[in-house]
Amino acid sequence: MKNTQRHKYKDKEICETRTLTFDPYPYSEIDQVIRLIQDNLTSDLLKGRKSLMYPSDVLTNKYYGHCYHSSQALHYLMDCDILTPMSGEDYRGEKHWWLQDGQKIYDCTAKQYLDRGEHPPYNTGKKTNWYGWKQRPQQISLTLMKRVLDDRLISDIVTKP
């Protein structure tokens, strides 16, 4: 069993905690989990995002805009601690995210490049901390995790101190 928590803060104090409790996937199933993540990427996960450099790409490229929360979801869904968040600047000057285990790359959204005849920016990649205060998981990542977990999800609970 594994817990992933996201705290909400007010005046630097925790005022709410969302906790997903679930049965994580074994590392040996990482390719299957990547496919599950890909199958669950939908445009509603991008609602409210202001940081997309090319918003019209969402209409023609299923994977565009999903690299961060896909990578973060994969990181938390796996039953291991050897996946490193990585990012690099792509051919259009946009940041792209993926995970690595040594030299092995796990990229849920690489097809956004490959389908255009381009290469993901692995050659410019570096270890990168998750965004946000205290590197907490994004709500979008938790929503994607719930979709992927299906019957592996034990609970999704919001508590207040």
Residue spans of the language-model regions?
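A structural boundary/capping signal
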Residues: 2-161
